[in-house]
Amino acid sequence: MSFSRTSIYLRLFSFIIPFSSSIFSGTNFPAMDIFTSSAHMSMGGAGYLKPSPLSSGINPSIHGGKVFSASIIKYPADVVSQNIGISYPFKNNTFASFSVNHISYGLFEGYDENLISTGTYNASDTKISATYGRGIFRLPIKLGVKSSLYLSNYGDHSFNTFSFSSGFSFRVDEQKITLGMSIHNLATNFSDLTVDFYPKVVISGSKSLKHLPLNIFLDLTSEDRSDVTVFIGGEFDINKNLQFRLGSSNRKSSQNIKKNTFSSIIGATGFGFGYEEKDILINYSIYMFGTGALSQSLEINIAI
């Protein structure tokens, strides 16, 4: 790629950043942003440009070849996320992926307006997603779209939601840099319940360092142009089989309840390891909240 073409891409990207940050505002439906990938959780939420058929936090134009993935994530308060996904490339520089994510919020005691017990009930969300993407001719640019159907059940209340995400990415091979932009959670609700949804704009970048076996990921997300969340994470190849990941975000301040110095420092931070043997990659991750609570995740990826 010539320097002039690289300059054009970077100028286009710098124009999109200030424009996109002013499009939307609001607070989103929590189930749309919960961790579903162990690798992304280990980087504290960074890695929108890291391929995963499981992750809810990924640019739809990104894919990682033929792979089947499954993960389980244990959150505080007995909240459990179970996820499976598959991605597959096709001819003509196209790919598709499919995933199912189930989140169980546990068992709750129900009460009527007179505070009389009505028994227990389960609360859960199930998301079914399909993604399609392709390259643009011979250019280093990829486009992708993702559609998701949410099936939510909260005792006597249930509702169905359809959401749509799209994104593009391009790679500058000489500098080993990938840049991308995506818009997530364009949603509509198919029920009598009123639920507010607000799209999220994400600006992402990743770089493979030249003299270190390290990939760095930087993501800026916004549902309100005055409130930007910054995620930064890294993936370090210790050797050909072992990986170490670490990441955090400026959510440290919002999660900081000043419980103690240690919790304030490590809040909103994730770390984890990956071990790869032949066609199998196993990831284990921990995410630490500012309250001192922990989430743990185990994930397996199988090349097919």
Predicted features and spans:
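Cleavable N-terminal export/targeting peptides
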Residues: 1-38
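Subset of outer-membrane beta-barrel
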Residues: 24-304
